[in-house]
Amino acid sequence: MSAPAPSTSTSAATRIVIAGAGPAAQALVAQLDRARFAGTITMLSNRDDTPEKLLELAMLPQVSVRFGQPASHIDAAKRTVATADGMEFTYDQLVIATGSAPVANPVDGAAQCLSYATIDDAPRIADGVQAVARELGRRPVGILVGTGAAAGQAEAVLRAKGVRPIRTTARPAAVIPAVVSAGSSSPFAASAVVFEDGSSMTGDLVVLAEERVARDGLAASAGLRTAAGGGIEISRDFRTSVPGIWAIGDAAAFDGVRLGLLVAAASAAGACATQLLSAASAAPAAPVLQAAA
C-alpha cells in the first residue's frame, strides 16, 4: 500500500498519542512523518531499551518517545492518557497499538527457530526456508508446531516454498538446534523440538506458530468494545467504538480476527495515517478494510 499523500493542511495543534511502540506504532509514525504531519506525536512505550528504529523516530522534531512509560489509563471523556508513573497526556486522536502476547509460557530455545505470529513474519519464514535449502542442497523437512489461523498461514507459506511440514499441536517444551558446520549460512538447519510429554521430533527447521492474545486490557478498561476472542473492535477505517480512539496492529480485531493475521503492519499503518490526517483536516477518507464474506 502506498504512503498517505503529503498534507500540510492539518492543524499544527493536532496532538496524536500512541499507546505502544512496537512495529505497528513505529510504522504509523514513519507514515505520518512521510506525509509531513504538522502536529505532535507522543509514543508511550513500555520498553526501557532503545532499539535503533525507535531512536530514529525519537529524533524527529514532532515526535516524543516516552521510554518505559506505558499507558495505564484512558479517560475518553477528557481525552487524556495517564502512565503508571502519573504522567498525563492530552490527545486529539489516540491510537492504541499495544500488540499481543503469547497465550502460553515462552518455549526454551525459541529464538533458535522460526516463528509465525502475524503476516509480517511470512517473508522471514520464506527466507529461512531458502537458506536451509541452500545449506542442505535439498528441500528441508519442516516441523510446524501450533494451532489456529496463525499455524494455517504458516503452513501455506511453507508449502509455497516447497516444504510439506509435519504439523503437530503438541505443546513444545524446548527447541534444540543441532550443531551447524563452520561457515553455515543458516542458524535454523537440523533443528529438533522436545514436547512436554517427553516425545520429540527432528527436522531441518522448526516453525512455532503458537496462539496469541491481544493486549486489549487498556482499551477494555476505558469502555472500548472488544471482540469475543480478544482484540479491540475496529471498523473498516480503524476507528474503535469510542470517538477519537483508533487501534492498529495485533491489539486490534476486525470482523473477529486479530488484525495482524489480516494485514501487514506497514499497510495498516499507511491506511490509518491517511484516516488520521483526514480526521485532523475534517476531510473524509475512504475506508480500507473489508468484512469477510
Please place each PLM-identified region on the residue numbering.
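Beta1-alpha1 glycine-rich phosphate/pyrophosphate-binding loop at the start
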Residues: 2-65, 138, 142, 149-174
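A Rossmann-like FAD-binding core segment of flavoenzymes
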Residues: 65-74, 78-83, 89, 152, ...
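FAD-binding core/adjacent interface of flavoenzyme oxidoreductases
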Residues: 2-6, 13, 34, 43, ...
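A conserved FAD-binding loop/helix module that cradles the flavin
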Residues: 248-293
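Intrinsically disordered, low-complexity terminal tails and inter-domain linkers enriched
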Residues: 3-12, 123, 130-140, 173-189, ...
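FAD-site-proximal beta/loop scaffold in flavoenzymes
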Residues: 111-133, 200-264
